[in-house]
Design a protein with these regions (language model features):
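Metalloprotease/metallohydrolase-associated module, dominated by Zn2+-dependent proteases
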Residues: 38-43, 47-58, 182-189, 214, ...
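Bacterial N-terminal signal peptides that target proteins for export
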Residues: 4-22
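Post-signal-peptide N-terminal segment of Sec-exported extracytoplasmic proteins
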Residues: 56-87
Length: 372
């Protein structure tokens, strides 16, 4: 089981340390006609197939055919689920009380795209979910076909398999979001963080603001995951997580530094053609340096290669997507501290921020970060 967990954790890193809220299916429920019936159909049918495959965790635990390793993980997931509700004040509802084996490595594949000299992601807008910087597909082949189409228009693209997505609690009446084989074998600390992250999306959702939504959920998963490990996990689980998280933090720091370097280069993207050629050259050097520094990290990690798939397709789309998940996290963590570590007060404060115009809420979080 440990080898399986390591393998699954490595696969998840194709969307590195970013357990995304894909919302592919829930967004499709409000699609306008111009989006296309094909995308609508794959979104709805893919989600329904997943829901139909899910069975209550209690059924899996009572089934003599269920492998003991899976029973152990499912039992752990239910302890985490109860902890999230009782200790973190996250919603206590139908989500993550059922399990489905999808017989594939990802639940959806997200397509992201950005211009040659910008980290600003292309967005897709839906009447229900608002505008998001990715487009989700239940079929990897369809995702790659969409990426190829976008690439043909001159955009840089990325296709990332993701292990989970949230329906924001809107479908709890139909059974909620299920546990999936795509993440159930994660190391304990990572499993706790994923469940906490996805439940956080059911607390607050600001339309048209992926960065706010994902940074909030990431802050909750970090704070809540730390509490789980400190109070519930075994010393072995804490040690395993410390090694895993240490690598993640080093990788994220490298990605963040490179992203800021690219941003500085692209600040001149209004320049005439000769200057643009210089920008392209500087960009190439920055990404080459990123890959060289990553190889140095791998050596220090003893050869751990979990981030290889992400690095292999590192481009503006990949760096732009990462920004949504960590840019505002320090501000949210500072806000949690200002609210005395009280989860209910923290969530209420975040809801007030979500009611503000986008620029105002971002500025408020950035100010809190500098004042902490």
């Amino acid at each position: 089981m440990k080898d399986q967990a390591a393998q699954v954790a490595q696969v998840s890193l194709t969307w590195p340390a970013i357990r995304t809220t894909a919302m592919a299916a829930i967004a499709a429920l409000g699609l306008s006609g111009c989006t296309g019936i094909g995308y609508y159909w794959q979104s709805v049918s893919g989600h329904l197939q997943m829901m139909n495959a899910a069975r209550p965790v209690s059924d899996w635990l009572d089934d003599a055919q269920t492998p003991e390793q899976l029973k152990t993980r499912l039992a752990l997931s239910q302890r985490i689920r109860s902890f999230a509700a009782s200790e973190l004040n996250l919603p206590d509802n139908a989500s993550y009380r059922r399990y489905a084996d999808l017989q594939r490595r990802a639940v959806v594949w997200n397509v992201v795209a950005a211009p040659e000299l910008s980290l600003t992601l292309k967005t897709w807008c839906f009447p229900v979910a608002g505008c998001v910087g990715y487009r989700g597909y239940f079929s990897e082949a369809e995702a790659r076909a969409e990426a190829a189409r976008l690439q043909a228009t001159g955009l840089e693209v990325g296709v990332f398999g993701v292990p989970a997505y949230s329906t924001l609690g809107w479908l709890n009446w139909a059974g909620g979001d299920p546990l999936l084989n795509t993440f159930i074998a994660y190391p304990e600390g990572e499993l706790a963080r994923l469940i906490i992250h996805e439940l956080a999306h059911q607390v607050v959702y600001a339309q048209d603001d992926t960065m706010f939504n994902e940074s909030f959920a990431t802050a909750v998963e970090r704070l809540g995951g730390q509490r789980w490990l400190a109070t519930q996990a075994s010393p072995a689980a804490r040690a395993e997580y410390a090694a895993f998280d240490g690598r993640r933090q080093q990788f994220q720091a490298l990605v963040r530094a490179t992203r800021h370097r690219l941003d500085a280069i692209y600040d001149l993207n209004w320049a005439p053609a000769p200057a643009r050629a210089a920008q392209v050259a500087m960009k190439s050097i920055a990404i080459s340096d990123f890959k060289q520094q990553y190889e140095q990290l791998k050596t220090a990690w003893g050869g751990f290669a979990g981030y290889d798939p992400w690095v292999a397709q590192a481009n503006n789309a990949a760096f732009g997507a990462q920004a949504a998940y960590d840019e505002l996290v320090p501000g949210f963590e500072a806000l949690f501290k200002r609210e005395g570590g009280d989860w209910r007060r923290f969530y209420d404060a975040v809801k007030r921020l979500a009611s503000l115009p986008k620029e105002e809420r971002h500025q408020a979080l950035e100010t809190r970060n500098t004042d902490k």
